């Protein structure tokens, strides 16, 4: 299908209707060359008077170059008009031209402002592009900001979501995007303020207060304050110093802006390595003195004052003469900054007492505004840090399989959070060992410090000097051994720091922040450290708290990854072990060939269709041939195309996977299967069940006690065995028997269901699971009421799936308990085997678990066996066989045998009672004879 041709006019119309799309595209895709072309086109042939650049974050300064336009005090020019009216917005009122003084860059004292060159405009544009918050007034932006959140915010989020891959990281980033924006108000023009200063000082002062009260951005607020102070006291330049480090007890005065006047952008006056700021120690120099003592300093000639430092003048080439310095206090009276005005205009005249009074009135408002801006900045910083921590959690959940990848993500996040030059992660070789030894180290260098940042991440396997320093880092070893963080502000002044190794490495370390990495068990698994903040300052308490919180999540992520690696190795070991066990747990080829070639006796010869079949009549090999005959007699080999060799191998392997316990062994499994075969063929239940269901119950009977350990489900729960932990406490052994059966079927050459269709296979596996789980007596008690009610009312309909389900469950239980339906000698012998196995479990409960076993498991109460057998028959067996006889009368011989065996147990019980009444001595001959049962 051919793509439709786009019309440029339609695209332009669309962008006009959706300016936010164009803005978003420009900010993401725009290049410097495009900005240069735009500036050249809009400035050529028009002169500088057509430009009205808005300095980012500052008051809107009208810098038109209307030649011949004097200032307010300079007289009227050719274009002056006595009828012109000032406009508070700094623009044109409807039909009224601007006053010449406002259109010019004049300040009211006759001096002209500096013109904004194209280079400066480009720098200003680049700075504004890097700043996320719009600090200049834009009518379109303001109108969009006033739209309801549902239209503006959702549109932006949808646009962002549609332009990014739908990953969890991008979705989370969009959801966590701040919904708080700085208020945007149109500032009044500087020349309008000059007019008010001449004609209405009260309104002039209110305008200055209003402009700073609406600004919550500390950068633009500081710039405004300096411009307005210059304007109030007619200073040539002003500087603002804010107090930092008060919380840590190391106060310093740091210039927010230095040497600014109302018309000059920020001058480069760097005295530090990485920033355009001046740091003044507390109490040093005039600025430090004012900050420490809170006094106003007004000096007519700065060079005559010994506190004055002329280094800045030498650096900038500017001559300081008069100076007015005053503290800025917050609402609590604490000094939060110092404002400095330099060289009163004209020609550096001394500042007057009126200047001091004006500043004293204005600076309290500045203090309140600065406090509000600092509070807002702190809240935004905490928001960004919280957002970063949430993104860290997302990163850790996304990657928990590869240690190198997760450490790389951790270090990238750490550099983003703390803005440092280098980040390192060191992992301990043995977390249990008292000797600290790092086995792995990872490092990441910031792009600012490395031209090849993409290749800076590596695992330190090379013998480089820096890698050696990482592994043998004494500070990291101290943190790993003590579990306490270390924050070194000046590495070369700390005795724990190896300055010689630092010099050899070629990387100059100034400050170090190192914290321990803990796992979920509160064990130290390594350390994380960051080096050298990009701004040259040491890491502060806020950095340390953030890094410690960050490392908590990282520790969990690293620990999970290490655990995953351990689990992966364990899984590999288990796979190898299972492969070895499966080799030894499967039958040999010779055994398979033997039974494959053997003649299988007929059903009549084996007597396996007899309900009263002798459970001990066949040896272990004869039971295999009898099982083969059952499969063939039921037509399952032909119906389901079961490979005969596979069937022989499967039966032999099933036999081999029964343990040599007293009762729940291969013979018991075969006897349960034989009784199921007899009931299917003798009672005609083949007509009730489907062929798939018949196959499921026959296989289920043979597999229903696979790998039985001679203990019941209650013992697994009491001992908190591995089986109980794996399968839970509900039908623990039955789930294990089924899973073991599945494992055998999945072994090579053992899948007797290989030729079934996909649906038949799925149905069969579900039926097989139901059949094996049905042998759990807990499930029998849950379902027998439903079965008994169906039988009592005669409402059963074998065409209904649910009726057949409960019927199959009852058949499985009836076959599992089938020994009680056999002749007395067989039934008593089985009871002795069951009791002996129970007694062994009771002995283990007494010796291993320190518990007193119940009567049926207590060897010391074995004389109570007849009574326990009567309770067993009456509560569990008799009701079941009575219900089955009602379903099919051909099972009446089974019920008769149960009744006959009950009479035998009743006789033994009565004899025991008589003997007990005559002689309470438990060593009597009768009681001793009963012990053999």
Curated annotation (Swiss-Prot):
Annotated GO biological process: signal transduction
Start and end residues of each stretch annotated as Disordered: 42-121, 913-933
Documented activity regulation: Inhibited by 3-isobutyl-1-methylxanthine (IBMX), zaprinast and dipyridamole. cGMP acts as an allosteric activator.
InterPro entries tied to this protein: GAF (IPR003018), GAF-like_dom_sf (IPR029016), HD/PDEase_dom (IPR003607), PDEase (IPR023088), PDEase_catalytic_dom (IPR002073), PDEase_catalytic_dom_sf (IPR036971), PDEase_CS (IPR023174)
Cofactor(s) annotated in UniProt: a divalent metal cation
Broad class of the protein's primary localization: cytoplasm
A Pfam family matched in the record: GAF
CDD domains per the UniProt record, alphabetical: HDc
Compartments reported by the entry: Cytoplasm, Cytosol
Residues that bind a divalent metal cation 1: 668, 704-705, 816
Binding site for 3',5'-cyclic GMP: 424
Domain PDEase: 588-912
Role this protein plays: Plays a role in signal transduction by regulating the intracellular concentration of cyclic nucleotides cAMP and cGMP. Catalyzes the hydrolysis of both cAMP and cGMP to 5'-AMP and 5'-GMP, respectively.
Written domain comment of the UniProt record: The tandem GAF domains bind cGMP, and regulate enzyme activity. The binding of cGMP stimulates enzyme activity.
Protein name according to UniProt: Dual 3',5'-cyclic-AMP and -GMP phosphodiesterase 11A
Organism listed in the record: Mus musculus (Mouse)
